Amino acid sequence: MAPLIPRLGDLLLVGFHGTAGEDDAELERLLCETRAGSALLFGRNVRAPAQVATLTAWMHARAQACAGRRLLIAVDAEGGRVMRLGTGAGYTDTLSHGDLGESGDLTATELEARRIGGRLREAGIDWNLAPVVDVGYNAANPVIVGNRRAFGPEPAAVVAHARAYLAGLHAAGVLTALKHFPGHGGSFTDSHLGFVDVTDTAKATVELAPYRALMAEGVVDSIMTAHVFNRRLDRRYPATLSRATVGGLLRGELGWHGVVVSDDLRMGAIEQHYGLDDAAVLAVGAGVDVLLIADDRLPDGRSAARVAVEALRRALEDGRLAPDAVGAALDRVDALRGRLDAPRASKTGRLSSGAGSASTRGRSHRTTGSDRRCCDAAARPAQS
């Protein structure tokens, strides 16, 4: 257990407020005291292309110096309305998933994703929390369909466009995340604001189809959970906190052994009902590997990341979390990080599934994700 405690920060993906690394006490604490394994950029961190590249270069260097490993820098860059590196900061406009789906042009989807990926790579960003593979079958859905974040209302089209989008991002050297598992397309409300019950609207066959198809093709880097409640899957907890949904359905039935990242634990659907402490422990216990905390500043001035780490530490010490489960989560995060560093073994980019399947602490695990590396070594961010 003791070797795990200093590495608990590796299970965090945290948002911060600064725009420059030097002399930023919050960012220094996050990278060097909490040792967060991943950092998340928002519009509040983005002023101009050169500024972002300078910020991420400092973050990569500082994390390497403090923690002795690569920092994963992530962003929501779906295109359209959800694009943190947007026109207000001097970047060109981008197409939404809805725009691309309506065009029916898969080549255009791949090219747009490649363009977005190139923008991220130049900015020093490693991980795009995209594409959205929610099937937009509910026209009244406010957060996915209303914001044009779905490729379409039919699973076949979602799979085809997501496949093209993944190919474009991977060609640019950027990691990806399918979201929001097990599906947010049927909801009538927004989990950013409060509790979302999809028991009567979820369509499992439809909503799981993109995950089944893309996982089978070996092109998935990570999967993000949704904060939706479906009593047919779990009568007590929403998906992010549900062992039945993450451990049972996603990892068990669907056979996913790669990284699972939560949606923001500070969203109303989670924070208002469970609190950050309990949510962090429940999520990791359910099978989530990376806890997304969009804002490190709690209303009382404390660091949300530190609260989460301390909650995980206490849960390890009192037996609520098994050391093997935490160790396996750390292994999967290490394997995801390694996907950026592994060169291609052939012109197709297909590699064996060996990397990350053996624990750095000597335990043996099944394949931790897809059987392809994300990125061409030549496409890695220069800051790395």
Regions found by a protein language model. Give the residues of each.
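Active-site-proximal loop/short-helix segments
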Residues: 80, 85-89, 126-148, 175-195, ...
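Flexible, glycine/proline-enriched loop segments at strand-loop-helix junctions
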Residues: 99-107, 146-156, 194-201
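Soluble non-cytosolic domains of exported or imported proteins
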Residues: 25, 103-111, 152-156, 160, ...
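Preference for extracellular/luminal or secreted protein segments
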Residues: 1-34, 243, 252-253, 271-384
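A generic, well-ordered mixed alpha/beta core segment in the N-terminal half of proteins
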Residues: 89-124
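Catalytic domains of carbohydrate-active enzymes, especially glycoside hydrolases
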Residues: 29-42, 115, 122-127
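Second-shell residues forming the walls of enzyme active-site clefts
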Residues: 6, 16-17, 22-23, 45-65, ...
